[in-house]
């Protein structure tokens, strides 16, 4: 399952939708959409576009939310929210 992961960043939403659809069409039973920080809303958009517009049979199997603690080069620590959305056929 580790190879069926889409990491969402700052690119346009449709790039990640296409990556997710490609994974599902190549035989993956599940695809994990992962994002951190400000990209979380984009990850939710990706999951909803895949489900509603392209593949209505796909369901949200699981959603995990968490917080990662990052340390900057100056030694300052900051918390960053993360999300994992598991889509399954």
Swiss-Prot record:
InterPro entries: Alba-like_dom_sf (IPR036882), DNA/RNA-bd_Alba (IPR013795), DNA/RNA-bd_Alba-like (IPR002775). Gene3D superfamilies: Alba-like domain. GO terms for molecular function: double-stranded DNA binding; RNA binding. GO terms for cellular component: chromosome; cytoplasm. Changing residue 18 to R: Less stable tetramers; decreased ability to bind DNA. Pfam families: Alba (PF01918). Keywords: Chromosome, Cytoplasm, DNA condensation, DNA-binding. Disulfide bonds: none annotated. It is found in: Cytoplasm; Chromosome. GO terms for biological process: chromosome condensation. HAMAP family: AlbA. Forms homodimers and homotetramers. Interacts with Alba 1. Binds double-stranded DNA tightly but without sequence specificity. Involved in DNA compaction. Belongs to the histone-like Alba family. This is DNA/RNA-binding protein Alba 2.
